[in-house]
Regions:
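N-terminal leader/linker segments that initiate helical-solenoid repeat arrays
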Residues: 20-109, 129, 162-163, 408-411, ...
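Structural motif corresponding to the intra-repeat A-B loop/turn of tetratricopeptide repeats
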Residues: 79, 83-86, 121, 155, ...
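Generic helix N-cap/helix-start motif at coil->alpha-helix transitions
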Residues: 31-32, 66, 103-110, 137-145, ...
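TPR-repeat structural position
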Residues: 45-48, 82, 89, 124, ...
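TPR/TPR-like (Sel1-like) alpha-helical repeat modules
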Residues: 169-173, 201-202, 276-282, 290-310, ...
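Residue-level recognition of tetratricopeptide repeat
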Residues: 74, 81, 116, 150, ...
Length: 431
């Protein structure tokens, strides 16, 4: 009897312990964010619409007041930020182009604004031309050097990027610290990157600057996630939403936690559907496709992938989704050649390690293993530390009978499964 009682207590304690362990895996709580999924209004969006109406009327009444065009452009950019509607980004471009032409590209702030619009469109070389034009004007040099750093990083011109970073050095500057964080993240030093981003956040909080707090909280949400600090990531996204309830990027971050960490596919889909109702961009279909793949629902996976391509056809996104397209096409031997064509264009547009990774991955998937290895060794190894890039590198090594080189990468990837997503768990274990 005593033995039976002891056994019962042991089993009960074990079940209790398992229950506690299971509960500790739960990072999110619906009560924290559900209120952000059914918002009826968006104050930022409403204000932008009112501003557009106001400035359009003023411009119509006085077409010689060119400065009104920049006001209109800024508000159309806000519409793009909150709705994802690419037409608003192009409208902003048209207004800024018209303004720059009227000023004969002599007003530095307007030139920089158009350059930033080009960055959003992934037209990086054109953005660089405008940034250099702004630098030649001379006015507001430090602001232009910040822009130059941003563009050079996108283009993979890292020595030039560092020169501009050093030129704006100021450890008390939010703008400098966030760029220093980006530079360290690029180098693969995530811990240092987080430290500098936290310093930037502290400045934003000290100044009580709402816009900078939103920016730093959302970016820290990403950085903490990359570092496996999921609870801190979640809290940062919630802080973002507390300041801007319509900030869809933070909700997307929470959806990723729910999917990748908690494996709650129904809740992840609920969040994504709520975001897509107001902020409709193609990448949400890809996320839903990933979730369906994890569930083993091939029909739903293909339905969402087709919806992604359908949206791509209906809208002109330019080069903005080239990376997504190349990765999708590379996964299917029948479309791998398409991936190769896109990857070549990407390398031409922005010869970064990530672009060369796309090229190497595409070559691997069309059966050119040695070509893939050559590109990876020359342009990727030691130059990008993104988990997906590292996975591609391991696969390239494995396909070239270099299993010993793939082994340490596999060990590193096993600690990056949250960032990679559930669908990579089996792939990484099979390396």
């Amino acid at each position: 009897m005593k033995t039976l009682k002891t056994t019962f207590l042991f089993v009960f304690a074990t079940l209790l312990l398992l229950g506690c362990e299971s509960k500790s895996e739960e990072i999110t709580s619906k009560e924290d964010y559900s209120k952000y999924l059914s918002l009826k209004d968006n104050k930022s969006l409403s204000f932008a619409h009112k501003e557009i109406d106001f400035w359009q009327k003023k411009y119509d009444a006085a077409p010689n007041q060119i400065s009104y065009l920049s006001q209109l452009a800024a508000n159309y950019s806000t519409l793009f930020e909150y709705t994802g509607d690419i037409k608003n980004l192009y409208k902003s471009e048209d207004l800024l182009t018209k303004s720059n032409e009227a000023y004969n590209y002599s007003r530095v702030s307007t030139v920089r604004s158009l350059a930033r619009n080009y960055i959003s469109q992934h037209r990086f070389k054109e953005a660089l031309e405008l940034a250099n034009k702004a630098l030649a004007i001379g006015e507001g040099k430090k602001e232009t050097q910040k822009l130059l750093f941003d563009v050079q990083m996108e283009l993979g011109n890292y020595p030039e990027a560092v020169k501009n970073l050093n030129a704006i050095r100021d450890m008390n500057s939010f703008d400098y610290l966030i760029r220093l964080a980006k530079w360290n993240d690029h180098k693969g030093d995530l811990e240092t990157a987080i430290t500098f981003m936290e310093k930037a956040r502290d400045i934003a909080e000290k100044d009580d600057n709402k816009g900078l707090k939103i920016w730093s909280y959302s970016n820290l949400g990403d950085f903490y996630g990359h570092a496996g600090r999921i609870q801190e990531s979640y809290v940062s996204f919630l802080k973002t939403l507390a300041l801007d309830p319509n900030y869809s990027y933070a909700l997307k971050g929470i959806a990723w936690i729910v999917f990748s960490k908690e494996r709650n596919v129904n809740e992840a889909n609920r969040i994504i559907d709520a975001i897509a109702a107001t902020h409709n961009t193609p990448d949400f279909y890809l996320l839903k496709s990933q979730i369906a793949q994890f569930e083993g629902n091939k029909n739903e996976e293909m339905k969402n992938r087709n919806a992604y391509f359908s949206m791509m056809e209906k809208n002109n996104y330019g080069a903005m989704y080239n990376k997504y397209n190349a990765l999708i096409y590379a996964d299917d031997k029948q479309t791998a050649q398409k991936a190769l064509e896109i990857a070549k264009i990407e390398v031409e547009h922005r010869p970064t390690a990530d672009s060369h990774d796309l090229l190497a991955w595409a070559y691997l998937n069309v059966g050119e293993n040695k070509k893939a290895l050559e590109i990876a060794q020359n342009h990727v190894v030691g130059k990008s530390f993104e988990p997906k890039v590292q996975y591609h590198l391991a696969m390239i090594y494995k396909s070239n009978n270099l299993a010993l080189k793939a082994k340490p990468i596999k060990e590193e990837l096993l600690s990056s499964l949250y960032e990679l997503g559930p669908n990579f768990e089996k792939k990484v274990n099979q390396l």
